[in-house]
Design a protein with these regions (language model features):
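Mature, function-bearing regions of proteins
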Residues: 2-3, 18-319
Length: 319
């Protein structure tokens, strides 16, 4: 007869990736395991909402590429309309990201993680970004999802690029409590100039659902008085096939060029609304930063802003 087992109660979240019972070392599978493919697509709307001093919103349909940096040759053989390192209808070039110092992107990214104290122990690095379309690309933000060998998310790198082609990577190790069943919550102080209408004394609050069947990216930018700007992307995963690429490029032709044009068009609209211009300070001396999480400013206002933004996005998406 087997001994009776005492009621163990609820499992404890240990490090944001694994759950274990009190007094036990056994671990359940990690939260949000990454897709197994070398590359896939995420399709959906991106929305920006300026909250003050003037209200301003826009929404565009886009598609992003999720690619395994250790499996670039395999990804490049997936379909005829997609290539790695050479021109095609849709393509990916390593030099469009990271420090672009001639090394393999995965190598330089692992070094950046090591400098932040993150060792993936043979795990994977998946990059979510806009690909080149007919040779042109621009990525306002690209995210590196960094997993250990067990598939647990250990860090995210938020790579921000402005229209001056200045680039900075915010390296964010996943700390205890940041990753839960609701997703990932992180924050960082703003270091690099991005917009002529946004001051530098600001904080980014990242609320993410890591890539799986879906991906959700939500960024709330706040100044000392409260939320100023939100940006969201809600993507559904699609296979990287010739048919999917052909349909997406037909539906959103010259997508990456339109992203750059849209940034300047929306900036003109903000200027016409009377927003003051902000001086452009020098770019950060370092290509990446691993500062501590930024302060959570005006949490109640942030929650209200997220509810309003999310409700608006859902209404637009359902139309």
């Amino acid at each position: 007869m087997e001994p009776r087992t005492a009621n163990r109660g609820a499992p404890h979240e240990t490090d944001g990736n694994f759950y274990s019972w009190p007094g036990e070392k056994a671990q359940l599978p990690p939260l949000f395991p990454p897709p197994v493919e070398a590359a896939s697509l995420f399709v959906g709307p991106v929305m920006h909402a300026r909250l003050k001093p003037k209200s301003h919103r826009f929404r565009y349909d886009v598609f992003s590429l999720l690619i395994d940096l250790d499996r670039l040759p395999e990804a490049g053989r997936t379909t005829r309309l997609f290539s790695v390192g050479r021109f095609n209808l849709v393509s990916f070039f390593e030099r469009d990201h990271g420090v672009a110092d001639g090394r393999a992107l995965v190598e330089s990214t692992r070094e950046t993680l090591a400098q932040a104290g993150v060792d993936l122990a043979g795990g994977r690095i998946l990059l979510l970004c806009y690909p080149r379309v007919l040779g042109y690309q621009f990525n306002p933000i690209a995210t590196y999802w960094c997993y250990d060998a067990n598939g647990a998310l250990r860090a995210v790198i938020y790579e921000v690029t402005n229209t001056f082609r200045e680039r900075h990577a915010y390296v964010a190790p996943v700390r205890p409590g940041e990753l839960t069943t609701a997703g990932l919550r992180q924050s960082r102080d703003k270091i690099m100039y991005v917009s002529p209408f946004l001051n530098m004394d600001m904080t980014y609050a990242f609320r993410m659902r890591p890539p799986g069947d879906t991906v959700r990216l939500r960024i709330l930018e706040s100044d000392p008085e409260g939320p100023v700007l939100s940006a969201t992307f809600a993507g559904e995963r699609r296979p990287l096939t010739d048919r999917t690429l052909a349909r997406l490029c037909a539906a959103t032709p010259f997508m990456t060029l339109k992203i750059t044009a849209a940034i300047h068009w929306e900036a003109l609209r903000l200027w016409l609304k009377g927003l003051a211009l902000v001086d452009h300070p020098p770019a950060p001396a370092d290509a990446s930063s691993v500062d501590a999480p930024g302060p959570i400013r005006h949490a109640a206002h942030d929650r209200a802003a997220w509810r309003s933004i999310t409700a608006s996005a859902l209404r637009r998406h359902d139309r």
